[in-house]
Amino acid sequence: MTRSRAWVVLVLFSLCLFGGLATGRELFYSLAYLWGGLLITSFVWARSALSGVILERQARSTAAQVGSVFEERLILRNQGRLPKLWVEIRDHSTLPGYWATPGPAGLTADEPGTARAADLPGHRVSSVIAGLGSGRELRWLVRTRCTRRGRFRLGPASLESGDPFGLFRISKDATPAHHLIVLPSTDPIAEFTVPSGYLPGGGALHQRTNQVTANAVGVREYAPGDGLSRIHWRSTARRERLIVKEFEIDPKVDVWIVVDASSMTQSRPPDLAEDQPRGILPRSEVRLPPTTEEYGIAAAASLAFHLLSRDRAVGLIAYGRVRHVLQANRGQPQLNQILETLATLEAFGRLGLDEVIRIEAPRFPRGATAVLITADPRQSLLVATQELERRRVSPMLVLLDAESFGGVPGSAALAERASRRGLRVRLIRCGDRVGNVLSGAAQPLPAWKVA
């Protein structure tokens, strides 16, 4: 539209100039001056329309979680000497979600105002600002309910403006792109029993360590390299020489979470569509997508959160688009790393869970527990668990009932056979509350709640 208008004015200018030269009449010259002046004025106006205009984006964090609200504050400043008639902000973010509770609109000469965001799905930063005076600024807050895990781009954003006649438009890049990672949601688990380590014959797993742990098992004389935190002061005072504490590796076993990310075992309804409600979303109404991939990742995230919060050492294995292996460790950094890995995990793997176990089984220490999360109903999974048991690793199955997700039947029968063999099994169906099932009780829940 802008180009066509400018071309129309240019054609009119050319015709009037040609008519004036051909006839010598002043009317044609006057019209030529008018159209020419309009073109020059509009061009100069458009060129200066974005002079001194700056857009800033301020995010509180580079990470969010499914169900939480991501907030981004935007500041549009006019540092130029001339007022701006209008400025359009165009954003190219890929963050899905739904707008939530923006502030009221308003702009005053003394204090910044708050512009109102559109009630549209997705992270909506794009807007049109009218009448931005010299030296003034406009602030507004974009709040988006995160509904999908993953790594998303925020920006880049560009500014557009033009002349009041709509003949010319100009644009410039305003902010570079940066990324936001949306972590999977975690559902609270009431109880999830993991056995202590064992040796052949049923003995507990005991091993001395040079590291300071919660298990002090005795004292010994000081050796070069021992830290001050190891000194047992009462024994030192009694024996009149430095005595240090000896520690033992925590008898709690390592727990390895193995997620089946094979593309061949995933199920989802054929008519699955984005069915989240539009508009303002209460936190409790963010639903888990009805796919085995999302339920499996939610189960893995919930287990990791539960076990790590109880000082367990947790590792993660998943063969998706790429191979993910996180060594077993404790603490908040390990939880963050596991959740970030699960956030970007895609079920495009080519190896089934039984093949992954055959490859990774030597990695598991003796006495560890392997939690296998899969929607694969094949009997080969039981053969893989036998391989783990031969290595003194305790397997536990978290089966996703593929039939309830629109896939092939067989998960319920596999769960029954595994239970008869003495394996601990949890069967998750579409609509179940994941935390309740992992705790030992299945309960249908229409809406997914975030811990």
Whereabouts are the PLM-identified features?
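Short hydrophobic "helix-edge" motifs at membrane interfaces and signal-peptide entry regions
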Residues: 14, 250-251, 365
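Structural motif marking the loop-to-transmembrane transition
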Residues: 3-7, 243, 381, 431-434
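Extracellular/lumenal glycan-associated context and N-glycosylation machinery
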Residues: 1-56
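Acidic, glycine-rich A-domain
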Residues: 297-298, 304-451
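Secondary-structure junction/capping motif
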Residues: 2-4, 25, 127, 290-292, ...
